[in-house]
Amino acid sequence: MLGAVGRCCTGALQALRPGVTPLKALNGAPAALFSRRDYVAPAAAAAAASGRIVAVIGAVVDVQFDEDLPPILNALEVAGRDTRLVLEVAQHLGENTVRTIAMDGTEGLVRGQKVLDTGAPIRIPVGPETLGRIMNVIGEPIDERGPITTKQTAPIHAEAPEFTDMSVEQEILVTGIKVVDLLAPYAKGGKIGLFGGAGVGKTVLIMELINNVAKAHGGYSVFAGVGERTREGNDLYHEMIESGVINLKDTTSKVALVYGQMNEPPGARARVALTGLTVAEYFRDQEGQDVLLFIDNIFRFTQAGSEVSALLGRIPSAVGYQPTLATDMGTMQERITTTKKGSITSVQAIYVPADDLTDPAPATTFAHLDATTVLSRAIAELGIYPAVDPLDSTSRIMDPNIVGSEHYDVARGVQKILQDYKSLQDIIAILGMDELSEEDKLTVARARKIQRFLSQPFQVAEVFTGHLGKLVPLKDTIKGFKAILGGEYDALPEQAFYMVGPIEEVVQKAEKLAEEHS
């Protein structure tokens, strides 16, 4: 849409003033408006317009220029500092002053300090050289392994692909996690959201998906750590080195990491998701790859935007969020898509404040997703992990024409029996199991077995649980649940279904339990 507006404006301006070039005419417009993604070789900085700092308000810095006011989204650099401080233009205030967002701490800045316009948005290194490396929001390496020297750089702001470039093929992405593959399967090239409150297992689930999908995938992956714990980022990096996904000795690494963790200023947290996305877009557009993009956590992207929004002087919207919440989210999510050249399959963890899915931040994200995996505190309290809510999680590709009629029928059968059990829980709580009919007793028994069979030991959580991690093929998952629904395992105790892989392990566990009791 913006691209179309930009092109219309350019045409109109040329018609009105033939002597003026489109670039000159749109000089005050956002950089993304008149530039499709351009990949260029890193160039030496040309002579740039300079300004001076006139105000510093937390992460927001006002800069005054005598001439050549930089357009919106341009990157400015503070001169005379040991570490590079990048400011991104957010508003034009009048009187040749721009309001900018700092990408790093503003400690030590003083009024009157010189600032240089780089003449372009924030540009980061892209290409195969980024694999195996960790970079920050402005593309600087933070893994203490020297500079990232790439042949090309790209701006972090760009338009979404045209409708005509998009691909509409639909195929299931098998994760090896029973509850996900059966009830809310993920689409290749789709957008997947993991919703959950604090401490219900979003990051563990995303780590398991990285372990199962990224390793088996064989293509490239990008992980963007947005405002989450530094410890988790560090653990992930070292796990990837140990498992061989990152190879420090040669160039066979399969993953690029982009971090802007909890301790970063809001400017960095609000932009680091775009940096990670830009790295993924290069592999999709230039190398025709099928890329996996993991983002942990999208809520922190919104939260950082909210922190900055108040400092920029915008009037807050519902629940104190920025008034541009839907625009910010849409601008980023529309770029995560599958084109005819390649695909980006994104898995995004989304924190749910106070377990309220109607909060504007998670509610705005729902509209953009192909599959939603909702993690429930009530299920986590039962000790069932992953704590996926089988009745709340949805998928656009849960369609018999895509997944097949057997898969569809088994999934709907599982959901029906769990819903029936949920309806009976009030009666059980008041009157007890003895007051139920024989049919209802059977429903409850099977539902409790299914509930436990939806649990699964994770490879990334082996050290915590003591259970060996399991990866279950889709056909085994369907076979197992179909057999439980059909009553083939009614005789087995429900604890035999807890924390196992395929259905064969249930039988083995039941035999083991019987031996222990005897």
Curated annotation (Swiss-Prot):
Superkingdom, natural source: Eukaryota
The keyword Cell wall biogenesis/degradation is annotated on this UniProt entry: no
Residue sites binding Mg(2+) 2 per the record: 228
Residue positions binding phosphate: 199-203
Pfam families listed in its UniProt record: ATP-synt_ab, ATP-synt_ab_N, ATP-synt_VA_C
Annotated positions binding ADP: 199-204
One GO cellular component term noted in the UniProt record for this chain: mitochondrial inner membrane
SUPFAM superfamilies: C-terminal domain of alpha and beta subunits of F1 ATP synthase, N-terminal domain of alpha and beta subunits of F1 ATP synthase, P-loop containing nucleoside triphosphate hydrolases
GO BP annotation list: proton motive force-driven ATP synthesis; proton motive force-driven mitochondrial ATP synthesis
Sequence positions that bind ATP: 199, 201-204, 229
Gene Ontology molecular function, alphabetical: ATP binding; ATP hydrolysis activity; proton-transporting ATP synthase activity, rotational mechanism
Entry-linked HAMAP family: ATP_synth_beta_bact
Quaternary structure (record): Homotrimer. Component of the ATP synthase complex composed at least of ATP5F1A/subunit alpha, ATP5F1B/subunit beta, ATP5MC1/subunit c (homooctomer), MT-ATP6/subunit a, MT-ATP8/subunit 8, ATP5ME/subunit e, ATP5MF/subunit f, ATP5MG/subunit g, ATP5MK/subunit k, ATP5MJ/subunit j, ATP5F1C/subunit gamma, ATP5F1D/subunit delta, ATP5F1E/subunit epsilon, ATP5PF/subunit F6, ATP5PB/subunit b, ATP5PD/subunit d, ATP5PO/subunit OSCP.
Protein name from the UniProt record: ATP synthase F(1) complex catalytic subunit beta, mitochondrial
Source organism per UniProt: Cyprinus carpio (Common carp)
Gene: ATP5F1B
